[in-house]
Design a protein with these regions (language model features):
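Short, extreme N-terminal segment that most often corresponds to the first beta-strand
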Residues: 1-31, 137-140
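Compositionally biased, low-complexity repeat tracts
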Residues: 2-3, 37, 53, 95
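N-terminal functional modules and adjacent low-complexity/disordered segments of proteins
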Residues: 4-6, 11-14, 41, 57, ...
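Intrinsically disordered, low-complexity segments enriched in small/polar residues
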Residues: 4-5, 32, 39, 59, ...
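Intrinsically disordered, low-complexity regions enriched in small/polar residues
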Residues: 11-13, 45, 102
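Surface-exposed, low-hydrophobicity interaction/linker segments
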Residues: 18-52
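Charged interaction segments
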Residues: 47-140
């Protein structure tokens, strides 16, 4: 999940929906319905490759307030690509600025994001998390 940490910055669901098709030609914005619509304004489906056992792509839950985006992805690579893209096109504030954006559930602690954070850096941090340094499996 990407979440705004105070300040005035908000994610723009319409902007993301407008900018997604050049990257994901089959992108589809679906308005949320029912009780979930109290929190989620819409879902942006970003399909993955259409092949047997292909990654399922990503689904973004765009919070009505613009303060958060839930991310469900088929692979870490797909998630990292989408997270980096969202931060770049949304021009998120720098980590030291009011309204900066945090990536939750990627590392043990919230990760401050910037508009220039590449997907490769997100994947490197994810690999570090899974290394023996973080799991406590240290050779004696």
């Amino acid at each position: 999940m990407l979440a705004v940490n105070g300040g005035r910055f908000r994610f723009d669901a319409d902007l993301l929906a407008d900018l997604a098709p050049p990257v994901w030609p089959e992108a589809l914005l679906v308005r949320a319905q029912g009780q979930v619509a109290d929190v989620i304004g819409s879902y942006l489906h970003l399909p993955g490759p259409h092949r047997p056992q292909g990654a399922r792509g990503c689904v973004l839950g765009l919070h009505r307030s613009g303060e958060a985006i839930g991310i469900s992805a088929g692979t870490d690579r797909a998630a990292a690509d989408v997270i980096a893209w969202i931060c770049a096109v949304s021009k998120v504030p720098q980590p030291h600025e009011p309204g900066h954006v945090l990536l939750l559930d990627w590392m043990p602690d919230p990760l401050p994001m910037s508009a220039s954070m590449p997907a490769e850096e997100l994947l490197r941090l994810r690999r570090m998390l899974r290394s023996s340094f973080f799991t406590g499996d240290h050779p004696e």
